[in-house]
Design a protein with these regions (language model features):
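Charged phosphate-binding loop/patch that engages nucleotide di/tri-phosphates or the phosphate backbone
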Residues: 123-159
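Acidic-basic catalytic patches of nuclease active cores, encompassing PD-(D/E)XK
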Residues: 1-37, 156-157
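Sequence/structural signature of beta-propeller domains
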Residues: 69, 105-109, 150, 154-157
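Conserved catalytic cores of phosphodiester-cleaving nucleases, focusing on short active-site segments
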Residues: 46-48, 52-65
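Beta-rich catalytic cores
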Residues: 42
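Active-site-adjacent loop/helix micro-motif of nuclease/hydrolase catalytic cores
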Residues: 38, 56, 64-76
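Short, electropositive alpha-helical surface patch
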Residues: 108-125
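Nucleic-acid nuclease catalytic cores
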Residues: 83-112
Length: 159
């Protein structure tokens, strides 16, 4: 049976998050299929609490090419429900697998993109700094990357 690269990416994300935040809470939400092709009713893949006072709602996405269309992020509307809640950071960890780069895009930044009429999230948006997209420091290891998610907390976590 072929390995789904996106699911394998989620496993790699889990390993890297736990390495970065060894004493943190991390919960993988089971996919609850809604009846639509490959669409879960959950707002995200993971609930993560690194111990810095913030709860992360993280959707993991793997995509080939230099951009991902919003149509490939069906969780957008559900994540948007958590925008602006104190202590909650909702967003997408995006691995552009052809480019070997990993990014964090908050739901607030995604909402700005949609309001600006954007149809996708692209590498160019990061490079020209038109939106606050955070690149996750990552090192290539064969197929996958070792990523350092502490950049999302500015290194702040409880001991």
């Amino acid at each position: 049976m072929a390995i789904n690269k996106g699911k394998a990416w989620e496993d790699k994300f889990r390993q890297d998050w736990r390495r970065c935040f060894p004493n943190s809470f991390m919960f993988r939400l089971k996919d609850q299929m809604t009846g639509y092709k490959e669409t879960s009713g959950n707002p995200c893949d993971f609930l993560c609490f690194p111990g810095n006072g913030e709860l992360f709602l993280i959707e993991c996405k793997e995509h080939k090419g230099a951009s991902i269309p919003f149509t490939a992020i069906p969780q957008y509307d559900r994540l948007l429900e958590y925008s602006g809640l104190p202590g909650v950071r909702a967003g997408v960890v995006l691995w552009l697998s052809d480019k070997d780069r990993v990014f964090w895009i908050s739901i607030e930044e995604m909402e700005k993109m949609v309001k600006d009429g954007k149809k996708s999230i692209g590498l160019k948006m990061f490079e020209d700094k038109s939106y606050n997209i955070i690149e996750i420091p990552s090192v290539k290891k064969r197929v996958y990357l070792d990523s350092d998610y502490t950049v999302l907390t500015d290194g702040k976590q409880e001991a």
